[in-house]
């Protein structure tokens, strides 16, 4: 799914699913008033992305971050910058897409496609 940025520029929405490590927990327990949201907003802005939210979760992932970015490379730069900091163990990136738009495109070409013969 894309959001319109300017006349000809669009940004895609990305979900960052992260797993924090002991270093993150130790740092936050030493200074629980740290505003990690502000840090991520600044990182996103420096790369031309828009930060939306940072949520801590229970389950397979400890944290979910939502941002709009102009391309996957920007999202990947955000991921590697955070990972390089050492307090996050891993981050998976999911790119949101418009299923209806995909379905229209796929439907427009499926009748003309033939699978390879066995």
What residue ranges belong to the model's regions?
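A compositional/biophysical signature of low hydrophobicity enriched in polar/charged and small residues
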Residues: 2-118
